Amino acid sequence: MEAEHGDVWEALRPLCARVMSVPPEAVVPQARLVADLGADSLDITELEAASEELFGVSLRGTEKAGVSTVGDVADLIVRLRTPGAHSPLAR
């Protein structure tokens, strides 16, 4: 799973930078989407849609309580891509 997490991170970092109009070096695992990167609700919606296309998982409708950093998003994507990890909310 560690290799997959690295792959997700490598794809997620430039995606977040593009969606939130920030330099890629600002996108670090501990960066908070709203407080640090300035994401608004439209940015979050765009990130969800782009993640669905890029990673083949839907973040919409998933339990996102506690997801506040870029690292949290990466962890959520890895969990959703793991067989058997899908909850009924993820559909």
Can you name each region flagged by the protein language model?
Residues M1-A49, E53-R91:
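Phosphopantetheine-dependent thiolation modules in NRPS/PKS and related acyl-activating systems
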